[in-house]
Structures are given as C-alpha cells and as structure tokens.
Amino acid sequence: MEEGGDFDNYYGADNQSECEYTDWKSSGALIPAIYMLVFLLGTTGNGLVLWTVFRSSREKRRSADIFIASLAVADLTFVVTLPLWATYTYRDYDWPFGTFFCKLSSYLIFVNMYASVFCLTGLSFDRYLAIVRPVANARLRLRVSGAVATAVLWVLAALLAMPVMVLRTTGDLENTTKVQCYMDYSMVATVSSEWAWEVGLGVSSTTVGFVVPFTIMLTCYFFIAQTIAGHFRKERIEGLRKRRRLLSIIVVLVVTFALCWMPYHLVKTLYMLGSLLHWPCDFDLFLMNIFPYCTCISYVNSCLNPFLYAFFDPRFRQACTSMLCCGQSRCAGTSHSSSGEKSASYSSGHSQGPGPNMGKGGEQMHEKSIPYSQETLVVD
C-alpha cells in the first residue's frame, strides 16, 4: 500500500502491497478545511466548558463536573494539533514539522481517543449512580471522587497510547521528496511479522477504545431509561413531556457517539484484517479511500461534545449568556445574582441548587430519591 494514505497517519499499514493504488487521490482542501473547522469550534466550545466549570467555587463542583471538564481538556488537547494534520493533508501527506511533532501529535490523537471515551464512560456511570442508585451508592460516590477517577483514566489513556509515541517516526517516501509520518514496526518486529503488530494494535485499540466503553455506556443508559420510564408512569400527564425530553437526549448522546466513532473503528478494523482475510483489491481500495472521511467524522466529535453535554443544560446556557454580555449593563444583574449558582454544576446528576430538600453541605435528602429531579437535562 502507498504510504501516503491517510491510514498511515495512524498505523503506516503496508499489508496489501500486491494491490495497485495508482488511482488514489488525496482530498485536496476539503479534509484540511474540516480539520480547521473542528479546530476553531473545538477550541472555542471546550474552552467555554472549562471556563464555566472552573469559574465556580470548588465546593459547588460535583464528580460529574470533573468528568465534563476532563472531557473538554482531552478534546482541547487534541484539537490544537489539527492545524498540523491539516497542513500535512493539504501538502498531499508531506510532513514538514519533524519527528518530534510527528510523535507528539500522533500520541495526542490516541490519548484523546482513549481519554474522551473513558471520560464519557465515567460520566455515564456517574449518571447511572445518580439516577438509578442514588442512595445505595452515595458513599461510593463520595469515597471515589471525580478527580481521583479521572486521574486514573488519564494515566490509563496515556499508557494505552504509548505504542504510538514509541513507534511513530518520519521517513522519506520512496521515489519522492515527501516526508511521511508513519508507524515503524521494524524496531519491534521482523518484516514478516509487522502485519501481526499492526493488526494487534489496531484491533486492541478498537476493543478498548470503543467496543467495551460503548457497551458500558449502553448498559448505563438502558438502566437510566428504565428507571426514568418507571418513575414517570406514576406521574401525571404533564410529566410525559419531561420523560420524552430526557429519553430523547439520552438517545442523542449515545447515537451521536456511535455515529462519530463507529465508521472510523469499523473501516480501520476491516482494513487491518485484510492481511488475514485477503480482501479483493477493489474493496481494499474502497476502505482506504473512505477512511480519511471516517477520520473527519470521528474528529467532529471533539467539537460536538460541548454542545451535547453542556449546551442542553439551561444553567450552562445562562452562564454562557452571562459571559457573552459580561460588559453590558442589561446583563450585569443576571451575572452577579445567578451566574455563580447556575453555572456551578451544570452537568447531570448534581445540579439542584440549595433548597428545602437539601441537607448539610448541600447533599440531596432522599424524599424517596426522585430520579429525574437529579438530572439537569429535564429542567424546564
């Protein structure tokens, strides 16, 4: 396979060298334009999420807020590398930034992939505890703080992405003046066994970075939906609107994650398995040509997360409004009176402010532990 393919931005595959790819063309300015759009939206959106979380007082933050902030950090760390990849793609896969940035930017891609999905899984589990098991798991949620959990997730993500840092390098493409950023397995494998390393790393990253976390998220949201539906069956008719709203948001969160990442992992896995299954060259070429677009779709997730996990919350929107019209007199009152409380815990599971149902330290008293009352996404 030609080393200029976008697959080689990640693995440097060469498992179907018997096929001819002379008809393959790069995507010109389209893919770089998408990368830069994701860069602009991702830096703005994730920066706004971090600003909203950390402007609140520490005692008002809950574990879900830490997961939200960690997710934003992962996405922000990744999107700042996109100008490098946009340049690389625009130059028809000619890397001008040297070996160090080849290693670092590639490493950050995979750290982001693992850290993001782990944070989403942690957030899903946090919602599960808050809605399905609010009383029985209260002590667990207090013992294992969001900060400790996210620290463990980040360490795990950094370790899982380490093969990319070690094996990534740059080299001249044969018979051209182009410099490629690719995975070099020669330091750990013979030529005949490189495909095994490639397939092993590719399949394992899909399993650990998508299949297992997505299964956990689906399980959490299944029990959340079941609990919400069971509760609202006891409510009056007007409660049906809240049920539909919450359940639809849950569906949007899960489906969006799947739509963004499933094409990437599916196409990547199919291509990697080509060494074993010997796909026809036409199908192999098809996989290689659509992979750059699947990659773009997965990257878009890094700029959608702020909207999906924060902008659905009216309290977060209030905080954004307070910031955007910070210098205007018409917003001064709102900014001083409500932004501190309303932006303190915009994430799901812990966003109810002090009130008649709050105990010491702002902990929720369980008046039968109404599940939906702990879910910000149903606030009118």
From Swiss-Prot:
Membrane-side (Cytoplasmic) residue stretches: 55-64, 126-146, 224-246, 313-380
Superkingdom of the organism of origin: Eukaryota
Outcome (variant: residue 88 to A): Decreased APELA potency. No change in APLN/apelin-13 potency
Stated consequence of mutating residue 97 to A: Decreased protein expression level and cAMP-dependent pathway. Decreased protein expression level and cAMP-dependent pathway
Alphabetical GO biological process terms: adenylate cyclase-inhibiting G protein-coupled receptor signaling pathway; adult heart development; angiogenesis; aorta development; apelin receptor signaling pathway; atrioventricular valve development; blood vessel development; coronary vasculature development
Tissue: Expressed in heart, brain, kidney, stomach, spleen, thymus, lung, ovary, small intestine and colon, adipose tissues and pancreas. Expressed in glial cells, astrocytes and neuronal subpopulations. Expressed in embryonic (ESCs) and induced (iPSCs) pluripotent stem cells.
Result when mutating residue 99 to A: No change in protein expression level. Decreased protein expression level
Impact reported for residue 101 to A: Decreased homdimerization, no change in APELA potency, increased G protein and beta-arrestin signaling pathways. Decreased protein expression level
Glycosylation sites: 15, 175
Cited Gene3D superfamilies: Rhodopsin 7-helix transmembrane proteins
InterPro entries listed in its UniProt record: Apelin_rcpt, CCR1-9-like, GPCR_Rhodpsn, GPCR_Rhodpsn_7TM
Disulfide cysteine pairs (residue numbers): 19-281, 102-181
Effect noted on mutating residue 85 to A: Loss of APELA signaling. Loss of APLN/apelin-13 signaling
Record's keyword terms, sorted: Angiogenesis, Cell membrane, Developmental protein, Disulfide bond, G-protein coupled receptor, Gastrulation, Glycoprotein, Host-virus interaction, Membrane, Receptor, Transducer, Transmembrane, Transmembrane helix
Region of interest (Disordered), ranges: 342-380
CDD domains in UniProt: 7tmA_Apelin_R
Domain statement: The hydrogen bond between Asn-46 and Asp-75 is crucial for beta-arrestin signaling induced by APLN/apelin-13.
Binding partners and assembly: Homodimer; dimerization inhibits APLNR-mediated G protein and beta-arrestin signaling pathways compared to monomeric APLNR.
UniProt-recorded name of the protein: Apelin receptor
Organism: Homo sapiens (Human)
